Regions:
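Signature of N-terminal electron-transfer/Fe-S-associated modules in redox systems
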Residues: 1-132
Length: 132
């Protein structure tokens, strides 16, 4: 899948499209692919999903899976950013649109992805300020 999460030394993350960068761009860098988001034990057995992954499942966000990696990467980076730079509740919808805007879904029409990300943002302490 195209997007991966790139952790930075300062604790921030970004989603990077592997499909538009040559492999040498990632030489010596740490990246997180879709397989690396969930928590696993030493044997590689799944222990728990991330809040983003769990919300996507609970909202039936994806059908074919084509876009899953991109939405997971973008939403994960977005929630990480909100933890450092929370948004006003009134600005949350537009912030989600900006964060997910570059990703293409061929099946669900995006609504379920947006609903899932909104839920994670609202349920993660410190991501949203001035909640109603």
């Amino acid at each position: 899948a195209c997007p991966v999460v790139e952790p930075h030394a300062d604790g921030t993350t970004s989603d990077v499209r592997t499909c538009v960068f040559d492999a040498h761009f990632f030489h010596g860098k740490s990246i997180v692919t879709i397989e690396g988001h969930a928590r696993k034990n030493a044997d590689g057995t799944l222990q728990s999903l991330t809040p983003v992954q769990q919300a996507f499942i609970e909202h039936f966000s994806f059908q074919c899976g084509y876009c899953t990696a991109g939405f997971v990467a973008a939403a994960t980076v977005f929630i990480d950013r909100l933890k450092r730079e929370p948004v006003e509740r009134a600005d949350l919808e537009s912030a989600i649109e900006v964060a997910l805007n570059d990703h293409i879904c061929r099946c669900t029409g995006y609504v379920r992805y947006y609903e899932a990300v909104r839920e994670v943002a609202l349920n993660t302490p410190g991501c949203v300020i001035n909640e109603a």
